[in-house]
């Protein structure tokens, strides 16, 4: 999932494709549209079973050619927080001076962040029962409580 983990824990217990337990409660959700972009904000208590009862808050600001993704984990007890961005199998990721460059055909997206970034093997599951090897960007945000940001810039 393209979301955060706290000490490796997901926001819910995923048992299989359609079996989910310990579902998080939505604490905040908002949408604000503009002439050329939008802002989405949401938070949940899916990590409340962990020490310090961390709350995850995400804000997405989208504008032509740019997406800002801001993650905050409020509370917590020093757990390591990571954010994951799954890449399509056709994408190739390479390190750049201030983050990563992701390419697919003629499209280039620069990922600029204050977090530590690595690339890991992952699975892309486009359909039930279908698993395709791919890569994911893993952003180590720091220890809870923590806030971090990644900016995705689309290059023509």
Model-assigned labels for residue ranges:
Residues 1-156:
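CBM-like, beta-strand-rich accessory domains located in the C-terminal region of large
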């Amino acid at each position: 999932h393209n979301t955060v983990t706290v000490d490796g824990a997901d926001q819910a217990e995923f048992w299989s494709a359609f079996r989910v337990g310990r579902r998080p409660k939505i604490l905040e959700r908002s949408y604000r549209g503009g002439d050329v972009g939008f802002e989405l904000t949401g938070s949940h208590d899916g990590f409340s079973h962990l020490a310090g009862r961390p709350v995850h808050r995400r804000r997405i600001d989208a504008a032509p050619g740019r997406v800002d993704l801001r993650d905050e984990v409020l509370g917590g007890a020093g757990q390591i927080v990571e954010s994951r961005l799954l890449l399509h199998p056709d994408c190739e990721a390479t390190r750049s001076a201030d983050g990563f460059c992701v390419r697919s055909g003629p499209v280039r997206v620069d990922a600029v962040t204050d977090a530590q970034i690595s690339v890991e093997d992952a699975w892309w599951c486009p359909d039930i029962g279908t698993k395709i090897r791919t890569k994911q960007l893993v952003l180590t945000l720091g220890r809870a409580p923590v806030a971090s940001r990644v900016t995705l810039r689309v290059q023509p």
